[in-house]
């Protein structure tokens, strides 16, 4: 899975962009935000609550990072589970 595929899923499922940031694409920061970042040769998933990190994990591949992003968000948006 790639970032573009992940963005397509988020839009298809009508997940408001204010709750996520994928490589800088997303809305303003709300209470809980899921961030997908690309740093060097690693991919990072951060989850922040009120601008405080509550989850921070690095991945070797974009596919792993995107799937983990969906897995974490599926706790709040169960409709995302079908993409994992």
Say what each PLM segment does.
Residues 1-28, 83:
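Negatively charged, low-complexity tracts enriched in Asp/Glu with abundant Ser/Thr
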Residues 57:
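Phosphoinositide-binding peripheral membrane targeting modules
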Residues 27-54, 72:
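Short aromatic-glycine-(Arg/Gly/Cys) micro-motifs in beta-strand/loop hairpins
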Residues 76-84:
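Intrinsically disordered, low-complexity charged/polar segments
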Residues 60-75:
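A short, charged, amphipathic alpha-helix used as a generic interaction element across diverse proteins
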């Amino acid at each position: 899975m790639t970032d573009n595929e992940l963005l397509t899923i988020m839009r298809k499922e009508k997940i408001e962009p204010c709750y996520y940031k994928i490589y800088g694409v997303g809305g303003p920061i709300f209470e809980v935000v899921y961030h997908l970042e690309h740093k060097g040769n690693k991919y990072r998933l951060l989850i922040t609550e009120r601008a405080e990190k509550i989850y921070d994990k690095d991945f070797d591949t974009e596919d792993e990072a995107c799937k983990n992003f969906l897995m974490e968000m599926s706790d709040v948006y169960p409709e995302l589970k079908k993409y994992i």
